[in-house]
Amino acid sequence: MTVGDKEELSDDIVETYSVSGASHVLALSGLHIGFLYALLLFVLRPLWRRWRRLKPLLLLLLVLFLVSFAFFTGLSSSVVRSVIMFSLLAFAGLQPEKPLTLNTLAATAFLMLLCKPVWLFDVGFQLSFSAVAAIVLVQPKLYAFWKVDNRFLRYLWGLMTVSMAAQLGTAPLVIFYFSRFSTHFLLTNLWVIPMVSLVLYSAVFLLMLTPLPFVQHLFARVVEALVHVQNEVLRWIERLPGAAVDDIWLDIWGVLLVYLFLGMAYYGFLRLTVRRVCFALLALLAVVSWHSLSIMSNASRQGIAFYSVRGCPVVHCMADNRHSWLACADSLPDMPCLCRALSPHWNRLRLETPRLVAGDYTTSGLSMRNQIVSYAGKRICLLSDNRWRNKSSSHPLSVDYLYVSKGYQGGIEELTSLFSMGMVVLDASLSDYYQNKIANDCVRLGIPYLLLSQKGSYRILL
């Protein structure tokens, strides 16, 4: 959690944080950089109060430390955004009368995209900037609703308004990418943000105890207990009724229309007039109309699909009654990875959870034998090993699609005596060299081919 390393997190823990709405604390973001910035500020502020001329130098030292931390943690987009924002905040301390606004956020985005334009399509980049923009715009308005004199209640109200604003800004993107909305996010953030601050500061103190191994070992038990308590409460929130709404979806145009509605609603909220309310209602009508149209156009239809999910070569055979089958080229497919990647797509098509087919199988309308799938009059050969190499036939078998994935080590020409191929589909698990080699063979033999690594997915309606 301190450095954003999620390699050793179990699937149960990741799911608990996802359902409860606390996933943002697992990934390094503005929350973590903010804690680090506050700690450094606490250490350095007494020095520049005593020697004012050192303030610019100490602020520069603070910024260099933040930049070093960003390099240490891998320069993820959310960390880079946070480091730039807090660096600007630090230098703004030299002129306190100039607050940070949306202009600062826009300047940060411009600098990041200038260095790496592809960040625009990064999920972390989009979520990070949408959350901060919503906090800057919406949180002060929400906070002004209730004037609280009690210091503790004022802190809780501030925490709640920040959570509501961030959730408002990121909800459309979260639904688009993850098909999930956590309903208990307020309760989660009221618990997890104070606990994360305790855990992070305790972890920093634990590192400082390195010269004292015995004391460090004892204090490690304290940190472990804090993490355990944090996780147990999140598990309790996960088990609450209606903790998350799953299987919901938006397409890209739906996301843009929802943001248009939120923008119009905010515009009307600033000054309530009939005209502004009408604009917001029209935007809401556009959202509902588009989503209804999408549901009708994405109704379950019979077809075959190939997906670009590295390490999971499958053929998805879909019926028009919401049932479907995943014919796997690998005997041990990574189903959790496949489901995480494709659940939003399946939800949008309103499909039930597909049935896994990993060996010889026969049912009404579909059969699979020797890695050859027959479905709805189409025949697909899954080529993931060398079983068909160095073999020939006087009567080549007609296959509509030859699906080549990692494991096959031969060429295409040697298979022409076995199969009459309509199209060759190259899985993303193949190396770039091998994809180019087979693609060149297909061009030479006049066989159409498809690169899933470039296409992303390929769906055939039957």
Residue ranges and their predicted role:
Residues 1-85, 91, 168:
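Aromatic-rich juxtamembrane segments at the membrane interface
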Residues 38-46, 207, 260-268:
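Hydrophobic, aromatic-rich transmembrane alpha-helices
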Residues 48-53, 92-104, 202, 268-276:
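Membrane-helix interface "capping/anchor" motifs
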Residues 61-64, 105-109, 277-286:
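Central hydrophobic cores of alpha-helical transmembrane segments
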Residues 75-259:
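Internal transmembrane alpha-helical bundles of multi-pass membrane proteins
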Residues 153, 241-302:
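Glycine- and aromatic-enriched alpha-helical transmembrane segments of multi-pass membrane proteins
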Residues 295-314, 424:
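Alpha-helical transmembrane signal-anchor/signal-peptide segments
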Residues 312-462:
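Extracytosolic and intramembrane catalytic regions of membrane-associated proteins
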